[in-house]
Amino acid sequence: MSTKEKLISHVMKEEPVGSRNKVTVVGVGMVGMASAISILLKDLCDELAMVDVMEDKLKGEVMDLQHGSLFLKTKIVGDKDYSVTANSKVVVVTAGARQQEGESRLNLVQRNVNIFKFIIPNIVKYSPNCILMVVSNPVDILTYVAWKLSGFPRNRVIGSGTNLDSARFRHLIGEKLHLHPSSCHAWIVGEHGDSSVPVWSGVNVAGVSLQGLNPQMGTEGDGENWKAIHKEVVDGAYEVIKLKGYTSWAIGMSVADLVESIIKNMHKVHPVSTLVQGMHGVKDEVFLSVPSVLGNSGLTDVIHMTLKAEEEKQLQKSAETLWGVQKELVL
């Protein structure tokens, strides 16, 4: 008899039970690992699968996480073969070429489209009913690419979008007002990145409109220069990349925030990238961030924002910028 047999008596033969809340992270780079640890520490899934083409790096990262299993409640698996991802509820795609210092997110695009042509069909093969969350940049265009390549309905393809931009915005407003970010209600919509749109008309604390107190807020004529906060949001990622070489922690926490809303069916509103054709005067088939409701079925509803004419114009300009790139893509 083995030690195990001497120690344990079987009462019944267990039937294999599939995972109920399996999450897959594709890509074990800085963003993938920050997303993985954030998901694990929030205890969101009963199984976390990780996949990457870099076999040694993947193996090392998975082992490193597995060595912390005592402190977690999640089974951790990893393989370069996508069969390891089978039957995932949510698949988070972070893989792709990394943004270089000074490189715009749009420059990355065709490099990452080619990577997606391999990744997306594999995800669909093993998790045909999953919710696909795209994090790789440029996120809005790659969410469109993932939607086209997957054949999924639009509610099951979501981009992490401006969830992080809005978090940065709320943090910086909070710093200026000496308040916690959760008490500063503010939204950034449109493109994740250089042409994002701050909705100054909606910024409020406890229902008090800040533009009501300072009608010039967010404009050139504002003596308090609130507009600089949006510039800081846009420049924030570039600044972090310049200082430490990449961004990871905040985007990882943002991803876990979105996964939580889906897995726990919270019906929480997030600014995430979705198909906005027909909204706010956008005519083309583009994905941009608008406040959207996330739950078990993915993205179930979109909130109709009341935008000022200038904000709507900026959103349309954002859409045109993205469409200009999208129509050149080879899918």
From Swiss-Prot:
Gene3D superfamilies: Lactate dehydrogenase/glycoside hydrolase, family 4, C-terminal (3.90.110.10), NAD(P)-binding Rossmann-like Domain (3.40.50.720). It is an enzyme of class 1 (oxidoreductase). Its EC number is 1.1.1.27. It comes from the Eukaryota. GO terms for biological process: lactate metabolic process. It is found in: Cytoplasm. It catalyses: (S)-lactate + NAD(+) = pyruvate + NADH + H(+). NAD(+) binds at residues 29-57, 98, 137. Belongs to the LDH/MDH superfamily. LDH family. Homotetramer. Interconverts simultaneously and stereospecifically pyruvate and lactate with concomitant interconversion of NADH and NAD(+). This is L-lactate dehydrogenase A chain. It comes from Dissostichus mawsoni. The lineage of its organism: Eukaryota, Metazoa, Chordata, Craniata, Vertebrata.
